[in-house]
Amino acid sequence: MSLRDALKTPSSEITDEAVYRDRRRLLQLFALTPALSVAGCAEADPPPPPKTVVTPAQARSGFRTAEELTRLEDVTSYNNFYEFGTDKTDPSKAAKTLKLSPWSVKVSGECEKPGSLSLDELLKGISAEERIYRLRCVEGWSMVIPWTGVPLGEVLKRFAPTSRAKYVAFTTLADPQQMPGVRYRSINWPYREGLRIDEAMHPLTLLATGLYGKPLPQQNGAPLRLVVPWKYGFKSIKSIVEIRFVEKMPETAWHDLQPSEYGFFSNVNPAVDHPRWSQKTERRIAGTASKLFAERIATKPFNGYADQVASLYAGMDLKKWF
């Protein structure tokens, strides 16, 4: 399946179709009225993101939520992607020149069918899906984002992992020529993340190729990133170039840098504070809310996906295995 095919699902399936029709009419209006002043446009409040319609079955699955979406402009301008800088606005400025084609992903380790595949080959034959997920950053802010992608488990199955594959390790591209942040040792590059095999195979775990019905922007992890909605955002590794099936728990970038602050599992848990701040509440960046003064809401265990994933951790001490 080509990326173009992967993103053919109409945007009306992400949000109310009438909203998209109104948006198109608005764009046509602007095109037909050049006399509209730029100053007037700048002064107007941006429209809130569209509301979504969620069926009971979708709500139970966790694949969609009726919560107010975060505006596209906020999703694409407020990012953590240290390969392009440490400020929230750095990635949207510095990542524009990241070359997305050709792009290949190497799959190796404890599997029967390893290989290096192009993006089209990796996703071939797997139907793309729309998922509206909450994203909770370990820093204490959150968003609600409509993603396009494929279930990670469906991709991993085609490599036939063996019984020794207990974990899945992921690696981000680290190219100092394209990624200015890699020239500095703020992190032990390349960026690495990992999941337990059952977490990787869980239906909620998404290999994302787009958001808001469009291909992923570079600053959001193009062309391929993880979205693991019940974990803190740094687990959703971006711009993936390597996947390895391994027997032992892999070392991950933030745990390597500060193991007392960033655990391997990093499930969203309001009962376990970060050593330097509380995790009981979060700033929800949604609608027209200011990023700095967004409403604080209570953080839910597993980011609100406990019904779907809590059983994965039955019997575990979640304060120890944070």
From Swiss-Prot:
The region annotated as signal peptide is 1-59
Question: Which Gene Ontology CC terms are recorded?
Answer: periplasmic space
Q: Keywords on this record?
A: Metal-binding, Molybdenum, Oxidoreductase, Periplasm, Signal
What family does this chain come from, according to its entry? Belongs to the MsrP family.
Q: Entry's NCBIfam families?
A: PRK05363.1 (NF003767)
Name the cofactor(s) required for activity, per the record. Answer: Mo-molybdopterin
For this protein, the Enzyme Commission number is 1.8.5.-
Q: Which organism is it from?
A: Xanthomonas campestris pv. campestris (strain ATCC 33913 / DSM 3586 / NCPPB 528 / LMG 568 / P 25)
GO molecular function (one): molybdopterin cofactor binding
Q: What does this protein do?
A: Part of the MsrPQ system that repairs oxidized periplasmic proteins containing methionine sulfoxide residues (Met-O), using respiratory chain electrons. Thus protects these proteins from oxidative-stress damage caused by reactive species of oxygen and chlorine generated by the host defense mechanisms. MsrPQ is essential for the maintenance of envelope integrity under bleach stress, rescuing a wide series of structurally unrelated periplasmic proteins from methionine oxidation.
Protein name per its UniProtKB record: Protein-methionine-sulfoxide reductase catalytic subunit MsrP
